[in-house]
Amino acid sequence: MDRIVEIEKYSFDETYETSLRPSNFDGYIGQESIKKNLNIFIAAAKKRNECLDHILFSGPAGLGKTTLANIISYEMGANIKTTAAPMIEKSGDLAAILTNLSEGDILFIDEIHRLSPAIEEVLYPAMEDYRLDIIIGSGPAAQTIKIDLPKFTLIGATTRAGMLSNPLRDRFGMQFRLEFYKDSELALILQKAALKLNKTCEEKAALEIAKRSRSTPRIALRLLKRVRDFADVNDEEIITEKRANEALNSLGVNELGFDAMDLRYLELLTAAKQKPIGLASIAAALSEDENTIEDVIEPYLLANGYIERTAKGRIASAKSYSALKLNYEKTLFEE
């Protein structure tokens, strides 16, 4: 599903985001409580000349978990090695990564909830005792070889904290949940990013882009790049509100940040007249798989009160009817 408001990373996002990503906490906008606590923990660890405790970042995609991991690396003066759980298929894959770490390194594992139970078992002693237990052979002849590891910090990122096993979650000494951004915060991010793109973004233009970015920096920056294209074609050094509106309307992103897929989803629910629709039925109607519905379409709609998720299925809220300019009929329980 190719959507400009897609929360998951596009292949080009890595390079693009890196060029616009802040390198320290001074340049990082938003998530103030998390920044404040991390600053304290980093200062304390440096004062004791120790590694940071292991850190778990959770929350919807695109809110800055990877950026925070890189900032922690910078602030600690440590090297960071990055991987994703789907890349770690065998215990040997993880062992190779761990044995190549140096003292004080940071290991960042994205989508950590996708680690298999067998991989988690290898990770437990590495996190707790900085030790790797490798089993050689099988059956009665099997032997366990213990390999000491350098002290390191594991930073895990997940969009589905509930899928982490309790033993793994409990081994993270610091756990933070990232929240959706305010439009004012996104506007500041956009204006700073525009300067790196050799553009000036007017405040009203930045707010217009922010308003349509689903409260997510990754989407905001992606939209900014497309708006910049419209400005470049018209030989404009300043991104105006008029140009931003033109670009965003052309991209099919409305004033609420909805695209055609969101509108189809909401139209399906509102047509049901507040009768719950199951996830499988929604996926079939939209010709999408269930994971895409849950991970890509629903998080923003749920967080902003457009839909409700019940045991029987999904229901459109009064806010959805308003967004689609439809009449909302109260249920018996609401009257």
Swiss-Prot record:
It comes from the Bacteria. It is found in: Cytoplasm. Residues 1-181 are annotated as: Large ATPase domain (RuvB-L). Its EC number is 3.6.4.-. GO terms for biological process: DNA recombination; DNA repair. InterPro entries: AAA+_ATPase (IPR003593), AAA_lid_4 (IPR041445), DNA_helicase_Holl-junc_RuvB (IPR004605), P-loop_NTPase (IPR027417), RuvB-like_N (IPR008824), RuvB_C (IPR008823), WH-like_DNA-bd_sf (IPR036388), WH_DNA-bd_sf (IPR036390). Keywords: ATP-binding, Cytoplasm, DNA damage, DNA recombination, DNA repair, DNA-binding, Hydrolase, Nucleotide-binding. SMART domains: AAA. DNA binds at residues 309, 314. The keyword ATP-binding applies. Homohexamer. Forms an RuvA(8)-RuvB(12)-Holliday junction (HJ) complex. HJ DNA is sandwiched between 2 RuvA tetramers; dsDNA enters through RuvA and exits via RuvB. An RuvB hexamer assembles on each DNA strand where it exits the tetramer. Each RuvB hexamer is contacted by two RuvA subunits (via domain III) on 2 adjacent RuvB subunits; this complex drives branch migration. In the full resolvosome a probable DNA-RuvA(4)-RuvB(12)-RuvC(2) complex forms which resolves the HJ. NCBIfam families: PRK00080.1, ruvB. The RuvA-RuvB-RuvC complex processes Holliday junction (HJ) DNA during genetic recombination and DNA repair, while the RuvA-RuvB complex plays an important role in the rescue of blocked DNA replication forks via replication fork reversal (RFR). RuvA specifically binds to HJ cruciform DNA, conferring on it an open structure. The RuvB hexamer acts as an ATP-dependent pump, pulling dsDNA into and through the RuvAB complex. RuvB forms 2 homohexamers on either side of HJ DNA bound by 1 or 2 RuvA tetramers; 4 subunits per hexamer contact DNA at a time. Belongs to the RuvB family. This is Holliday junction branch migration complex subunit RuvB. It comes from Campylobacter jejuni (strain RM1221).
